[in-house]
C-alpha cells in the first residue's frame, strides 16, 4: 500500500486526454485532472487552444488538440499528434456528447415525427463519437502501457431512468453504460489487466444543450426544471466541479480494483422514489 493516502489520488507524472474538453463539463474535468498533477490534452472541435491557454495561465499543464469525434480518421490524426508530444496516454475521458432539438419531442414535434437524421446524430455523437471511436484509437495505445491506465466514459442518469422527451439521448447513454462494462472486461481479459474502464453518470447539470429544457427566457425554472429539482434530494442542479472528485478517483490508483462500473453523480436523483 502507498505510504500516503494522498499519493493514491495523485496524478503526478500521468498524461490525460479529454474529448469535448473545451465544453462546460469537459473544461471542469480538465482543470481537475491538471490540478491533481496530470498533463492534460484538451481535445475538441473548437476552442481547444483557448481552453488550454486558460489552464496554462493558472499554472497548470495543458495543451489543446483538434478532434472530430465523429470521424475516426480525425481521431487517429489527433492521437498521432498527442502521442508525438505526450509519448504515452494514461487517462482517457470521453466527455464529448450532447442532445439535439431535432431528437427531442415537444408539442410541435411528436415522437411519431422525430426525424431519423436527428436521432442518428444523437446516437452517433454520444455512443460512437462519445465512447467507441476514441476508445478504439487511444485504447490501442493504452493497452501497451505496462502500468495500465484508465478510460472514463460519460454516461447519464438517463441510462438508469429514461426521461421523457429525449428518446435518442436516453438510448445512446444506456448504450454507453453497456459498452463501458463490455470494454472493461474485453481489455482486462484480452490485453491488459491494469487498464480499467468505468463511467460517470451525471444527473442534471445545466449545459448549452439542455438549458432550453430547464430554464426559460426569464431565467426561471421551466415546469420540467421544477420537477427535476423536486426529485433531487440535494435540491439543486449539479455544478461542473461536482464531477471532479469522482473523475480523479476513477483516474487514479485509488480505484485500481474498480473496473466496469457506472457511478451516479446526481444529487440523489436515482435513489429518490418520489415519496
What do the predicted segments below correspond to?
Residues 191-196, 258-260:
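Short, small/polar-rich loop/turn modules that mediate ligand/substrate recognition or access, typified
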Residues 80, 121-145, 184-185, 189, ...:
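Amphipathic alpha-helical dimer-interface segment in Rossmann-like NAD(P)H-dependent oxidoreductases
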Residues 103-123, 228:
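Substrate-binding pocket helix/loop in short-chain dehydrogenase/reductase
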Residues 2-7, 247-248, 259-275:
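Short C-terminal tail/terminal secondary-structure segment
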Residues 126, 130-133, 199, 220-254, ...:
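C-terminal helical subdomain
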Residues 8-41:
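Canonical Rossmann dinucleotide-binding motif of NAD(H)/NADP(H)-dependent dehydrogenases/reductases
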Residues 135, 172, 180:
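Active-site helix of classical SDR
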Residues 156:
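Residue(s) in the substrate-gating loop at a strand-loop-helix junction
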Amino acid at each position: 500500500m502507498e505510504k500516503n493516502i494522498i499519493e493514491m489520488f495523485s496524478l503526478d507524472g500521468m498524461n490525460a486526454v479529454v474529448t469535448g474538453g473545451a465544453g462546460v463539463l469537459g473544461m471542469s474535468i480538465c482543470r481537475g485532472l491538471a490540478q491533481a498533477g496530470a498533463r492534460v490534452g484538451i481535445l475538441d472541435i473548437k476552442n481547444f487552444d483557448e481552453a488550454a491557454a486558460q489552464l496554462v495561465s493558472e499554472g497548470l499543464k495543458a495543451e489543446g488538440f483538434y478532434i472530430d469525434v465523429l470521424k475516426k480518421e480525425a481521431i487517429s490524426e489527433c492521437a498521432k499528434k498527442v502521442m508525438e508530444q505526450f509519448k504515452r496516454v494514461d487517462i482517457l475521458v470521453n466527455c464529448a456528447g450532447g442532445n439535439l432539438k431535432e431528437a427531442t419531442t415537444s408539442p410541435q414535434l411528436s415522437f411519431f415525427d422525430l426525424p431519423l437524421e436527428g436521432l442518428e446524430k444523437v446516437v452517433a455523437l454520444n455512443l460512437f463519437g462519445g465512447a467507441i471511436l476514441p476508445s478504439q484509437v487511444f485504447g490501442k495505445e493504452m493497452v501497451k502501457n505496462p502500468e495500465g491506465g484508465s478510460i472514463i466514459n460519460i454516461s447519464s442518469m438517463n441510462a438508469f431512468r429514461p426521461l421523457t422527451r429525449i428518446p435518442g439521448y436516453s438510448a445512446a447513454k444506456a448504450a454507453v453504460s453497456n459498452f463501458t462494462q463490455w470494454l472493461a472486461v474485453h481489455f482486462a481479459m484480452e490485453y491488459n489487466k491494469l487498464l480499467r474502464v468505468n463511467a460517470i453518470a451525471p444527473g442534471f447539470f445545466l449545459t448549452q444543450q439542455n438549458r432550453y429544457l430547464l430554464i426559460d427566457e426569464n431565467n426561471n425554472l421551466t415546469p420540467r426544471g421544477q420537477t427535476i429539482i423536486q426529485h433531487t434530494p440535494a435540491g439543486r442542479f449539479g455544478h461542473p466541479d461536482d464531477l471532479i472528485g469522482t473523475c480523479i478517483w476513477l483516474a487514479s490508483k485509488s480505484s485500481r480494483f474498480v473496473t466496469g462500473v457506472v457511478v451516479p453523480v446526481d444529487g440523489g436523483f436515482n435513489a429518490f422514489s418520489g415519496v
